[in-house]
A protein has these predicted regions:
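Predominant activation on well-ordered alpha-helical scaffold segments within soluble catalytic domains
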Residues: 20-24, 49, 95-98, 141, ...
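Helix-loop-strand module that forms the ligand-binding subsite of alpha/beta enzymes
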Residues: 63-112
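A generic membrane alpha-helix/interface feature
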Residues: 27, 53, 80, 95, ...
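Conserved active-site and cofactor/substrate-binding residues in soluble primary-metabolism enzymes
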Residues: 17, 21, 43, 68, ...
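Short alpha-helix boundary/capping segments
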Residues: 14, 85, 89, 128-132, ...
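Residue-level signal for pocket-adjacent positions within structured domains
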Residues: 7-8, 68-71, 87, 117, ...
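Phosphate-binding/catalytic loops
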Residues: 97-158
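Nucleotide and nucleotide-moiety/phosphate-recognizing core
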Residues: 2-6, 11-83
Length: 158
């Protein structure tokens, strides 16, 4: 089984970098675990579809702005996310990217889980995360490791 952990975000937008930070820490902890790739991505849309191709399972890690409590860590499925109408394919959302990949015959993952960290601000240029989001990094790492253990049929976190 091939599993991808993909941290998403923009390192210049403060809280939006949380997915990248979590992925980097997960990578450090999983150096010797076969079958699990940990990567980071600053783009979305069709690029996201390409990155997921060929994996059996994918765990995405990203900041979310839903009006919840900053720093809250949640597990979501693609169906939990709203679809968006965009003017170009470059802005395609995750649910649409998965559908399009399957329609094109790409080997898309059978399961995608999103570990979402509620952000305070993803539109402000800053190099550091807000305190609540920075404090959520370790709980998000733990959530990713638990998700990987579940996907691999193991007890507890990897």
């Amino acid at each position: 089984m091939r599993i991808l952990v993909l941290g998403l975000g923009n390192p210049l937008l403060g809280d939006d970098a949380v997915g990248l930070k979590v992925a980097a820490l997960v990578r450090d902890r999983l150096k010797d675990v076969p079958g699990v790739d940990v990567e980071e991505e600053e783009a979305g849309g069709l690029r996201l579809m390409e990155r997921m191709t060929g994996y059996d399972r994918v765990v995405l890690v990203d900041a979310a702005v839903t009006g919840g409590t900053p720093g809250e860590v949640r597990r979501l499925a693609p169906d939990d996310l709203p679809t968006q109408r965009t003017a170009t394919a470059h802005g395609i959302d995750l649910p649409s990217a998965l559908v399009l990949g399957r329609q094109l015959g790409y080997p898309m993952p059978s399961e995608v889980t999103i570990v979402a960290i509620e952000a305070e601000s993803v539109l402000e240029f800053r190099h550091d995360m807000t305190p609540a989001v920075a404090a959520a990094v370790e709980p998000a790492v733990a959530a990713v490791l638990e998700e990987l253990a579940r996907a691999r049929g193991e007890r507890g976190a990897i």
